[in-house]
Amino acid sequence: ETRYEKFLRQHVDYPKSSAPDSRTYCNQMMQRRGMTSPVCKFTNTFVHASAASITTVCGSGGTPASGDLRDSNASFALTTCRLQGGSQTPNCPYNADASTQRIRIACVGGLPVHYDKSI
C-alpha cells in the first residue's frame, strides 16, 4: 500500500457511504477501512469528495502552508470520527461530527499522502 493509497483508504469516501445515522457511519467505516485493529484509531476524518478533487489541493486548488502541507482553497464535506473515551478494541465506538470546511493535507509528488486537519 503506497502512502497515497493509504490516504485514500483512510480519508476518502465518495460518494458518502450510506448509514442510518452519523455515529453508525463512523462505527462501520472505521472498521471497514481497517482502523480498529490492532488498536482503535483515536480520530479520523473522511472527506466526501472525489480523489481527483482532493488531489487538486496539491496544485492549483491549494496554497502552501508549511513544509509539504497545503491548505485547500475550497471547502469539503467532512465527517470526523472520534473514539468515545476509554474504549478498547475490538468494540471501538465512535462519535461523529459532520461539517463543511477547508482542509490541510500533505502532498508528495503531487499526490495527497497525509490528512493534517480541517481549517
UniProtKB/Swiss-Prot annotation:
<keyword id="KW-0456">Lyase</keyword>
<keyword id="KW-0255">Endonuclease</keyword>
<feature type="binding site">
    <location>
        <begin position="41"/>
        <end position="45"/>
    </location>
    <ligand>
        <name>substrate</name>
    </ligand>
</feature>
<comment type="similarity">
    <text>Belongs to the pancreatic ribonuclease family.</text>
</comment>
<dbReference type="InterPro" id="IPR023412">
    <property type="entry name" value="RNaseA_domain"/>
</dbReference>
<comment type="subunit">
    <text>Monomer. Interacts with and forms tight 1:1 complexes with RNH1. Dimerization of two such complexes may occur. Interaction with RNH1 inhibits this protein.</text>
</comment>
<protein>
    <recommendedName>
        <fullName>Ribonuclease</fullName>
        <ecNumber>4.6.1.18</ecNumber>
    </recommendedName>
</protein>
<feature type="disulfide bond">
    <location>
        <begin position="58"/>
        <end position="107"/>
    </location>
</feature>
<dbReference type="GO" id="GO:0004522">
    <property type="term" value="F:ribonuclease A activity"/>
</dbReference>
<feature type="disulfide bond">
    <location>
        <begin position="26"/>
        <end position="81"/>
    </location>
</feature>
<feature type="binding site">
    <location>
        <position position="9"/>
    </location>
    <ligand>
        <name>substrate</name>
    </ligand>
</feature>
<feature type="active site" description="Proton acceptor">
    <location>
        <position position="11"/>
    </location>
</feature>
<keyword id="KW-0540">Nuclease</keyword>
<dbReference type="InterPro" id="IPR001427">
    <property type="entry name" value="RNaseA"/>
</dbReference>
<feature type="binding site">
    <location>
        <position position="82"/>
    </location>
    <ligand>
        <name>substrate</name>
    </ligand>
</feature>
<dbReference type="GO" id="GO:0005576">
    <property type="term" value="C:extracellular region"/>
</dbReference>
<feature type="binding site">
    <location>
        <position position="6"/>
    </location>
    <ligand>
        <name>substrate</name>
    </ligand>
</feature>
<dbReference type="GO" id="GO:0050830">
    <property type="term" value="P:defense response to Gram-positive bacterium"/>
</dbReference>
<dbReference type="InterPro" id="IPR023411">
    <property type="entry name" value="RNaseA_AS"/>
</dbReference>
<dbReference type="Pfam" id="PF00074">
    <property type="entry name" value="RnaseA"/>
</dbReference>
<feature type="active site" description="Proton donor">
    <location>
        <position position="114"/>
    </location>
</feature>
<keyword id="KW-1015">Disulfide bond</keyword>
<comment type="function">
    <text>Endonuclease that catalyzes the cleavage of RNA on the 3' side of pyrimidine nucleotides. Acts on single-stranded and double-stranded RNA.</text>
</comment>
<keyword id="KW-0378">Hydrolase</keyword>
<keyword id="KW-0964">Secreted</keyword>
<dbReference type="GO" id="GO:0003676">
    <property type="term" value="F:nucleic acid binding"/>
</dbReference>
<dbReference type="GO" id="GO:0016829">
    <property type="term" value="F:lyase activity"/>
</dbReference>
<feature type="disulfide bond">
    <location>
        <begin position="40"/>
        <end position="92"/>
    </location>
</feature>
<dbReference type="InterPro" id="IPR036816">
    <property type="entry name" value="RNaseA-like_dom_sf"/>
</dbReference>
